[in-house]
């Protein structure tokens, strides 16, 4: 890659800075120990630091050089520290004739020692002494440190003599690494040279294997802490998998183990090819550019690439929007491809550690505890061997000789449960050019791939290895297009390719029964889907394969499936099944979460999509995999319950079990069942209570819940309470039910929703019923927060009391919402176009209003308030959030119980809802005007 001119002289003039600092002591004959001189020096250093950083940021924006920026910032700090040391030694703690003990070397260590700094990086310094500390040394160090701290810098420091450094480095890997990266800054050069010479001979020379083990273990621990996946959509640029620290770890090990000082020497040692080392440099430069931009933009040492800065950094780096992919999505795709390259380099490097040239290094065979290499033949092949419990290549021509071996490597690894030897993965990565049209159409290659995909051992792991090695995207070019692709959304936790691979893992988990308690229905259906098993696995792998294209990804994905599946060896029938599943993979999830499942029209419409019980079963399992594979915390028991309800209702209709009895007859039967269940009530009370409820309540609410409601209302009436709440926890469904009894009024649901927001409750569903005596019996479901029922019940009762306080006027809703809520981090950077639709074809009895927009605290309360102002009667509400996006659906009628069919009225409703979504306050008299229309 082209070398960028550093232009270091434009950042800071060290000599000029010294002259300016010295000039501050003119009035005191060169004495800089006074408070005035110190204040002047501090002000001067602050100005030069700010100027230098501003110039470095401008240069980064101009040339985009990440390494160059890090080197410039390091040079800026070098000059400041050198000038500060000279000032302290010359003007503050002046000693005419220093003793041999009054010597010091200022040494940059750790990251700063590499000569690279991010704007918010720690400044790690070693004050190196020849012997014990002296008063002069102690005062000088203290002066420098306090000045650096007053500059707002985070300084890590140690004051040690050479013997202490060596003794501590033998037992502390962190100290050993910091000295490994040590760089002389200022002072006595001989002290630094002696330290480095003795460190190399007394520590490094005899501890290579131990150091390698420790750094690799440290890397694994760091990944676990920062996020194990390389494809988390808010990655940690410094410590995450595929981040800067991984590259630095490779270089540390290289310097330590191969005794080199520069990266170029690793090419000379045969560790990397020249092309691979260029990849190393490009990856490092890109990651440094991203990290420096992050620090400049946030004004702090921010290491996680949060959503709220991704868009700005994409703009700074010059990314533009292309059809199907926004600028920020293109930037993040590049980021994840770089992270993947870092993974490739890591595998190649680990392979090099085990290659022949490394065995000449003393102690190499002790790097890994099991490194006595035990090789044996692998049954069924002469191309691969088992090398120390890992599958390896028999020779370097394995893939060249027969490209199908690229697939056989993974097939044999899966069959025998073997890990991969780094040599095999290194050669595979270097052989990806062998994947061509002929291999993609090869019958055996496709059979092997299908076996790997549908394996009952560990398909997820092998697919991830194939993907990280680059084979999966080469084998299926359409899959290659979504490798490292992120979706700029708070809902999606992983890149598209990682999501698909995780979905395969969920499917295997369902089939094994590992998650039977989480999704019992899906698990129970799997044995009956054996004939369609291959089609199901392929559909799960391909369902998002067309993401990032301008057209609808479900329809485009179906076309891709019809083209790919025959080459995989699927029959025409299975190919069509896969295509149908891909095209409709969102249908069940969206229907379950955004429609009223008690409305027969919902079930009829969904049944017309699936048309058969077999497809219904397949779509349910795919839907579960899709939601579970999005990321932690997305799946919950409530979503599972919605899917099960939709499944059972649709299955009943498809098998002819749906009753054709008239609504009036069913209402009469339900009323009779309720009366019979209340047989122990006095006749007068029973007749009165049963007569309170309208048909929608009787046909929608299960009898056990009707009986709970009856006792609840009876107790409230006996106590003379016009306002009451009742709670019930649902552990398996992960929701808590709160029933509210109150005098009916138009804004009731709006007030309840606002109270829930103020109490920290997240409403996921609501059923609204009125009684013949003018009361409302509303049931809301809120997301569960606690594991133990006792804790959740106490929390729900607190929410219930808050609802009562708001409805009775004891608490003021706007103040409570403002006090108890704040927007999700990063939500403000997302742009969700607001949408409001009023449709009369989704229900036979209700108009269905669907709104979509950017979620914010109190939005549900605002929307329901708007609907009430529009004189609409809400029968049910279904609330769904996808990260920063909310989709709320309301089943409504006008105040006479009729659908909204006037075009003018529909337009008014839509305009008011759009204004609410956009945060525009309604005009005065809006309610009266809307009602008149």
From Swiss-Prot:
Regulation: Uridylyltransferase (UTase) activity is inhibited by glutamine, while glutamine activates uridylyl-removing (UR) activity.
Keyword Nucleotidyltransferase assigned: yes
Region annotation Uridylyltransferase: where it falls in the sequence: 1-379
InterPro entries named in the record: ACT-like_dom_sf, ACT_dom, HD/PDEase_dom, HD_domain, NT_sf, PII_UdlTrfase/GS_AdlTrfase, Polymerase_NTP_transf_dom, UTase/UR
GO MF terms, alphabetically ordered: [protein-PII] uridylyltransferase activity; phosphoric diester hydrolase activity
Catalyzed chemical reaction(s): [protein-PII]-L-tyrosine + UTP = [protein-PII]-uridylyl-L-tyrosine + diphosphate; [protein-PII]-uridylyl-L-tyrosine + H2O = [protein-PII]-L-tyrosine + UMP + H(+)
The protein's Enzyme Commission number: 2.7.7.59, 3.1.4.-
One Pfam family per UniProt: GlnD_UR_UTase
Cofactor or coenzyme needed: Mg(2+)
Region (Uridylyl-removing): 380-736
Membrane-crossing segments per the record: none
SMART domains according to UniProt: HDc (SM00471)
UniProt keywords, alphabetically: Hydrolase, Magnesium, Multifunctional enzyme, Nitrogen fixation, Nucleotidyltransferase, Repeat, Transferase
Top-level taxon: Bacteria
Domain HD: 496-619
Mitochondrion found in the keyword field: no
Residues in ACT domain copies: 737-818, 848-922
GO biological process, one term: nitrogen fixation
HAMAP family documented for this protein: PII_uridylyl_transf
Annotated PANTHER family: BIFUNCTIONAL URIDYLYLTRANSFERASE/URIDYLYL-REMOVING ENZYME, BIFUNCTIONAL URIDYLYLTRANSFERASE_URIDYLYL-REMOVING ENZYME
Free-text comment on this protein's domains from its UniProt entry: Has four distinct domains: an N-terminal nucleotidyltransferase (NT) domain responsible for UTase activity, a central HD domain that encodes UR activity, and two C-terminal ACT domains that seem to have a role in glutamine sensing.
NCBIfam families the UniProt entry points to: PRK05092.1 (NF003467), UTase_glnD (TIGR01693)
Similarity comment: family membership: Belongs to the GlnD family.
Function description: Modifies, by uridylylation and deuridylylation, the PII regulatory proteins (GlnB and homologs), in response to the nitrogen status of the cell that GlnD senses through the glutamine level. Under low glutamine levels, catalyzes the conversion of the PII proteins and UTP to PII-UMP and PPi, while under higher glutamine levels, GlnD hydrolyzes PII-UMP to PII and UMP (deuridylylation). Thus, controls uridylylation state and activity of the PII proteins, and plays an important role in the regulation of nitrogen fixation and metabolism.
Name assigned to this protein: Bifunctional uridylyltransferase/uridylyl-removing enzyme
Organism of origin: Mesorhizobium japonicum (strain LMG 29417 / CECT 9101 / MAFF 303099) (Mesorhizobium loti (strain MAFF 303099))
Gene from which this protein is expressed: glnD
